[in-house]
Amino acid sequence: MATHTFSCIDGHTCGNPVRLVSGGGPRLEGANMLEKRAHFLKEFDWIRTGLMFEPRGHDMMSGSILYPPTRPDCDVAVLFIETSGCLPMCGHGTIGTITMGIENGLITPREPGKLSIDAPAGKVDITYRQEGRFVEEVRLTNVPSFLYAEGLAAEVEGLGEIVVDVAYGGNFYAIVEPQKNFRDMADHTAGELVGWSPKLRAALNAKYEFVHPEHPEIRGLSHIQWTGKPTQPEAHARNAVFYGEKAIDRSPCGTGTSARIAQLAAKGKLKVGDEFVHESIIGSLFKGRVEAAAKVADRDAIIPSIAGWARMTGINTIFIDDRDPFAHGFVVR
């Protein structure tokens, strides 16, 4: 029997939690972060569930673990952990990790104001604005993002037929726009969205296959993005992103915003240089932009960037005690 100790810095990005594991992360094998992610999931997923699930975490918890980069053009490597698994990429997690990492001396960029992270989804370039010891804004240039499929239909109990577009922005997202059985996220409670989302996700995954054309290790639809009209005057759209089993992202969701920008660009509604301000379910904002056109295999894609802010809320020392019957956490469904 042993007690495993993890040093953590807690914070949030535009309202959504980030738990940065600053000490206690396991040594991982692999030539790149995708391979290290696979090793973590095989041997150490109990760390993720122990730190993210109750009683040490909660339904919305997400976090990250820092590692030395596996490639010479990056300053630091990041493994993203959350209630739904180890994401290839996490936008709000990146903003929070960079903010708290720099403010607490865990990350030292080679060039002030900019750095690159080595994520399982690939290299992510970042700029940040620092005033004194505080990082006030982080902008990440995300991985190539693209519209994967249009007009996919699935039946959802209690809602009826729902038609979605699926786009990739670091994870696969089903984007639910206004239609016969869903007019606007504002017409529904968060509880209703949480109830419908896993049914819609399961139906889509059962009916269709979602595989990244260049990275077959990245597969499966993981997130549902419900959309609506903005309530903030500077925003172009509002969204509520469902992930895990019961979570609605409190931030506008970085990879979700990337996927949304890719979808709109593919439909001719955004072009290179255009900005897209995305509002979350609680009114916080991410500032997105189409940075460049790109290709992913034979698919047209874009390079999106996302800007947002984060704040540190505390420092934790967390124990996972092998004697604890809930050492690896639990989820109440």
Swiss-Prot record:
It comes from the Bacteria. Induction: Is slightly up-regulated when the bacterium is grown on t4LHyp or t3LHyp as sole carbon source. Its EC number is 5.1.1.8. The active site is at C90, C253. The keyword Isomerase applies. Substrate binds at G91, H92, H223, D249, G254, T255. GO terms for molecular function: 4-hydroxyproline epimerase activity; trans-L-3-hydroxyproline dehydratase activity. The keyword Isomerase applies. It catalyses: trans-4-hydroxy-L-proline = cis-4-hydroxy-D-proline. Keywords: Isomerase, Plasmid. Gene3D superfamilies: Diaminopimelate Epimerase, Chain A, domain 1. It is an enzyme of class 5 (isomerase). It holds the Pfam family Pro_racemase. PANTHER family: BIFUNCTIONAL TRANS-3-HYDROXY-L-PROLINE DEHYDRATASE_2-EPIMERASE, TRANS-3-HYDROXY-L-PROLINE DEHYDRATASE. Likely catalyzes the epimerization of trans-4-hydroxy-L-proline (t4LHyp) to cis-4-hydroxy-D-proline (c4DHyp). May be involved in the degradation pathway that converts t4LHyp to alpha-ketoglutarate, which would allow R.meliloti to grow on t4LHyp as a sole carbon source. Belongs to the proline racemase family. This is Probable 4-hydroxyproline 2-epimerase. The lineage of its organism: Bacteria, Pseudomonadati, Pseudomonadota, Alphaproteobacteria, Hyphomicrobiales.
